[in-house]
């Protein structure tokens, strides 16, 4: 693995998973890169593995139940800084459509779900919008 790559568990197709070196995720403006500390396998990950996810395209890095440490921030991190322990909210929404304005981001007209529409967190790093981060209390291991 070089400085520009990371390890990720890639679902190539139903029932076929490979541990691969993949490029580090880009960190666009308004995003943070998070180094994974822990992930949880969700029922939707199992459905994807079995080929029962209608929304997922292959290959895909699964995983949307994530906890990690901020490794890089592009832009104003607001209350977040490099080194903060965070949990990651899985829905990436536009913030502007009718559903988003009613705080129903899961119904966003442009909804992207980590590990379904975009690369997830069963990898060393994931890149997510800063607004999708939730700070983990420092007292929590």
Where are these regions (language model features)?
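Short structural boundary motif marking the start of a folded domain
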Residues: 3-9
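Intrinsic-disorder/low-complexity, polar/charged segments enriched in Ser/Thr/Lys/Arg/Asp/Glu/Gln
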Residues: 5, 17, 31-33
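Short Gly/Pro-enriched turn/cap motifs at secondary-structure boundaries
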Residues: 12, 24, 57-63, 114-118, ...
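Short N-terminal binding/cap micro-motifs at the start of the first secondary-structure element
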Residues: 15-19, 43-44
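Glycine-rich beta-strand-centered segment in the early N-terminal region that forms part
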Residues: 25-39, 52-98, 132-139
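Cytochrome P450 core scaffold surrounding the K-helix E-X-X-R motif
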Residues: 44-50
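NAD(P)H dinucleotide-binding glycine-rich loop of Rossmann-like/cofactor-binding domains
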Residues: 94-141
């Amino acid at each position: 693995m070089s400085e520009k790559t990371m390890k990720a568990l890639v679902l190539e197709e139903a029932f076929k998973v490979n541990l691969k070196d993949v490029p580090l995720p880009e960190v666009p403006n308004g995003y943070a890169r998070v180094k994974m500390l822990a992930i949880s396998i969700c029922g939707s990950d199992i459905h994807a593995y079995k080929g029962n996810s209608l929304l997922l395209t292959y290959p895909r890095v699964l995983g949307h139940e994530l906890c990690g440490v901020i490794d890089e921030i592009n832009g104003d991190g607001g209350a977040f800084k490099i080194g903060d322990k965070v949990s990651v909210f899985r829905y990436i929404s536009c913030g502007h459509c009718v559903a988003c304005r009613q705080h129903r981001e899961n119904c966003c007209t442009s909804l992207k779900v980590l590990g379904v529409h975009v690369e997830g967190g069963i990898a060393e790093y994931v890149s997510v919008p800063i607004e999708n981060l939730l700070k983990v209390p420092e007292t929590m291991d």
